[in-house]
Amino acid sequence: MTRETVVFLPGLLCDRAVWEPQLAALSGRYDCVVADYGATDSLRTMAEAALQSAPPRFSLVGHSMGGRVALEVMRNAPQRVAGLALLDTGYQARPEGEAGEAEAGQRHRLLDVALSQGMRAMGREWVPGMVHPERLRDRMLIESILEMIGRKTPGIFAAQVLALLTRPSAEAVLRAIRCPTLIVCGREDSWSPLSRHEEMARLTPGARLAVIEQSGHMVTLEQPQAVTAALQAWLAAGD
């Protein structure tokens, strides 16, 4: 009997390590594939890379930037996706005017730190806003995130920043989704807030929203058991 495939899409500066708890729990039942974007600098080309590594039909899970990549997969090949899970992500284009310039300035400032001081130094500035405040005392968690960031280069960081700053709106994509969809958000995610995920759930026909308590943006690592349980229920419902 052919096993179902689940494709996992990491977020900004992340790799398979961000999914390790979920891979460990799900790989006994599903064929799990983690996409690698290389040094691509657009969400569209990241989605193309993910599609090239995937079988004809699969379930799709994206976290943060990976959620936006998942929406580009849905824009271009919705017929291949059996189910969709979007975690701590967004769907809007970069805003115009001062808000958009502020976002670009913030991202470019971190890129400057990466170029001048290294990726781990940049990570030490970036990570505190990515996790629940109480998790900042979890040295193993913080070190695992910093190690993951350290495996990337400033060039990859620059490419991914460009991809995010040039992101398209995916509102029409959400409205057109017809597969079982799970939307997950850490309640204390200050980067991709719960209100945004509530709006995504409203826009997506039949979507279910799962709120993960005591978690910020890095929900797969901060609360791995809760995230895994939500994914298992979503996958089982689609079987």
PLM region descriptions:
Residues 1-47, 59, 63:
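Conserved HGGG/HGGXW glycine-rich cap/lid loop of the alpha/beta-hydrolase fold
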Residues 62-66, 70:
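Gly/Ala-rich beta-loop-alpha elbow adjacent to hydrolase catalytic centers
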Residues 75-76, 80-117, 121-124:
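Flexible "cap/lid" loop of the alpha/beta hydrolase fold
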Residues 98-99, 117-176:
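Conserved alpha/beta-hydrolase catalytic His-Asp/Glu region
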Residues 177, 183-185, 189:
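Short beta-strand/loop motif that positions the catalytic acidic residue
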Residues 179, 193-202:
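Short alpha-helix in the alpha/beta-hydrolase fold that links the catalytic acid
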Residues 198-217:
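Catalytic histidine neighborhood in serine/cysteine hydrolases
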Residues 215-228:
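Catalytic histidine-centered segment of alpha/beta-hydrolase-like enzymes
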